[in-house]
């Protein structure tokens, strides 16, 4: 299994099988019980790298960093090998550039790649990001 993780406050974890096929996507609040069950089968995980963004408040920047640290701790505790990946690196070649990269094109791409994934709503852009990160993880770390 391969994991893609969007560590945002409303982030998600996506799971792909060894063939790169969709298994599930789990919202942040529900992750801990799922990762306990999956940990032994995970080959590799990619965690989106976080950094302060212009216009982002101090509190939200802190929360974003705190969530990233939480994820790193969970992955290490369950002995899941992982790397961090910059948004530009996982988006390259997957998300079409329309001026500035936005979350909506990523959602559209993920819906096409993973039609069985629950990505019905616009607010599911974090799930979409996690799926695309998992896709890159599978491509780079798989077989």
PLM region descriptions:
Residues 1-143:
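Phosphate- and other anionic-substrate recognition elements at nucleic-acid/protein interfaces
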């Amino acid at each position: 299994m391969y994991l893609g993780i969007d560590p945002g406050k409303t982030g998600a974890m996506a799971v792909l099988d060894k063939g790169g096929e969709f298994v599930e996507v789990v919202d942040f609040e529900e992750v801990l019980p799922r990762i306990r069950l999956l940990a032994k089968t995970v080959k590799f995980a990619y965690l989106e790298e976080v950094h302060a963004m212009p216009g982002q408040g101090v509190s939200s920047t802190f929360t974003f960093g705190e969530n990233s640290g939480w994820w790193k701790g969970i992955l290490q505790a369950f002995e899941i090998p992982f790397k961090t990946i910059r948004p530009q690196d996982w988006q390259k070649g997957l998300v079409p550039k329309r001026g500035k990269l936005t979350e909506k094109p990523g959602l559209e791409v993920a819906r096409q790649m993973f039609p069985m994934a629950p990505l019905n709503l616009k607010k599911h852009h974090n799930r979409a990001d996690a799926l695309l990160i998992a896709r890159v993880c599978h491509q780079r770390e798989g077989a």
